[in-house]
């Protein structure tokens, strides 16, 4: 018996998905559209009946374990998607897919290959802002675009969205061959299925720390625009590998900026983080220094270049982040571990953050700092409860929540900006501009000169190589918030023999 498929939403997206299923013939049969539009309920579209309203008709459908529902309403707000999902689950649907809505709703395109299993990202948080990708990506038409860290969560989503940008070439740079291979293959499949435009996609394996190789890559690719996402980012891991954090994040960024200025790259966009604000971890300091580098190199840019950074908070679903961790803990029966009942974070979905980054890359000016409006913070314990419920379970009854205390480099609240940065609205929704907080002349260069022999073997300074105690001392001398945080931890009696 063919799998019966119910498509939620009989609009353009739903009809296109139905057409794809009919053409491919191997995914089952579309049994009906479900829709709330009274003007089409009771009609047929290409021989497929339209039933509704969604909430009412779902309860009387006869469905088996094989049957599948596809939510194809990319314009629907998050609250409505959540309601539809809960209705489907309540009425016995075990297989629920969704057509993500960031770009499809704007461009009027939809493809079966873009559907995926629904996950908590689709029903958590606020409704993402709708951005016209084709309009915001006009500055990339016919250009060569390079993404560093293209195999990561942000880099790979930028690559997916850039398929709609009309770029001539899309370079995927990363040091992990598996992740680069994965996104490269995914983009090729999307292109084969008609998603986006026919950019030439080129995978490149390389290490940001290799100055000569990075210079060679930028020269050879003749890229016009760089989105710099590559970074070591896991805070506790970087507290155990402090030299590596500075070596890769700071000097890798410097290498890329040197090459970008030298080879006249038109636009350079650094992806930054709220952990760069009054940092309390080596990772946070590394990203703060990357921001300072961008402001410094903007002064070296010629009149046709624009060097900028875009800062934002946590994204839901990134690798190694809280959401995948909670999901894996639920799969093993719990408990879910939460740092503190008061801990809260700003969250945004990866597709929304990337759409705003791409828009900022086009409208941003040289030497400017930008911040994405993250909305209101969410308590981590509330997020844990929502994810447990999404899994069809009850918090504390089926899955326990355990308070475990802060890890190295963590704080209960992450500020998005310093008071003196004074964020102001721009002409573009959810994109704020910051007042630059630059180092005085010579301060950054002096610090980097002292950090260099710690990160890279240097004749005459062999004793400094990989000396993390000296590295942390230098960082604490430069960054008061890091020094204060480490001293507070030491006072609290926590063991920090690795750094103090």
Language model features: what each stretch is:
Residues 202-225:
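Conserved Rossmann-fold cofactor-binding substructure of NAD(P)-dependent oxidoreductases
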Residues 5, 24, 130, 135-139, ...:
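Strand-loop microenvironment adjacent to phosphate/nucleotide-handling motifs in alpha/beta enzyme folds
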Residues 1-94, 178-182, 199-202, 206:
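A solvent-exposed beta-alpha-beta segment
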């Amino acid at each position: 018996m063919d799998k019966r498929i119910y498509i939620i939403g009989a609009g353009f997206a739903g009809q296109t998905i139905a057409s794809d299923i009919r053409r491919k013939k191997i995914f089952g049969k579309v049994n009906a559209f479900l829709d709330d539009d009274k003007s089409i309920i009771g009609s047929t579209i290409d021989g497929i009946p339209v039933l509704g309203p969604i909430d009412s008709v779902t309860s009387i459908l006869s469905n088996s374990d094989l049957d599948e529902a596809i939510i194809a309403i990319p314009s629907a707000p998050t609250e409505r998607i959540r309601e539809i999902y809960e209705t489907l689950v309540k009425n016995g649907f075990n297989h629920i897919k969704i057509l993500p809505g960031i770009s499809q709703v704007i461009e009027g395109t939809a493809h079966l290959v873009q559907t995926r299993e629904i996950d908590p990202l689709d029903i958590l948080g606020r409704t993402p802002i709708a951005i016209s990708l084709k309009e915001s990506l006009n500055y990339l038409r016919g250009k060569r675009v390079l993404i560093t860290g293209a195999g990561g969560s942000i880099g790979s989503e930028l690559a997916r969205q850039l398929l709609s940008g009309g770029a001539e070439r899309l370079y995927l740079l990363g040091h992990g061959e598996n992740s680069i291979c994965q996104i490269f293959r995914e983009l090729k499949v999307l292109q084969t299925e008609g998603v986006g435009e026919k950019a030439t996609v080129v995978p490149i394996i390389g290490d940001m720390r290799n100055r000569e190789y990075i210079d060679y890559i930028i020269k050879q690719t003749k890229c016009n625009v760089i989105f710099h996402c590559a970074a070591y980012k896991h805070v506790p891991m970087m507290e155990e590998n402090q030299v590596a954090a500075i070596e890769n994040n700071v000097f890798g960024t410097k290498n890329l900026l040197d090459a970008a200025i030298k080879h006249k790259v038109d636009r350079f966009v650094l992806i930054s983080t709220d952990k760069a604000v009054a940092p309390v971890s080596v990772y946070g300091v590394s990203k703060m220094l990357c921001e300072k580098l961008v402001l410094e190199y903007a002064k070296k840019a010629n009149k046709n270049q624009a060097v900028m950074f875009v800062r934002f908070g946590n994204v839901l679903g990134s690798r190694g982040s809280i959401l995948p961790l909670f999901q894996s803990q639920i799969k093993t029966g719990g408990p879910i571990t939460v740092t503190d009942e008061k801990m809260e974070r700003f969250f945004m979905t990866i597709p929304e953050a990337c759409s705003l980054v791409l828009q900022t890359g086009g409208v941003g000016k040289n030497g400017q700092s930008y911040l994405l409006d993250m909305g209101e913070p969410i308590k981590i314990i509330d997020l844990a409860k929502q994810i447990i419920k999404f899994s069809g379970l009850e918090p504390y009854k089926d899955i326990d929540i355990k308070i475990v205390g802060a890890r190295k480099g963590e704080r209960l609240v992450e500020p998005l900006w310093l008071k003196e940065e004074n964020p102001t609205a721009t002409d573009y929704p959810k994109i704020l501009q910051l007042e630059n907080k630059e180092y005085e002349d010579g301060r950054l260069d002096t610090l980097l000169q002292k950090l260099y022999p710690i990160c890279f073997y240097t004749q005459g300074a062999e004793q400094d190589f990989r000396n993390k105690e000296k590295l942390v001392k230098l960082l604490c001398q430069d960054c008061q918030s890091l020094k204060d945080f480490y001293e507070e931890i030491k006072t609290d009696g926590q063991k920090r023999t690795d750094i103090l």
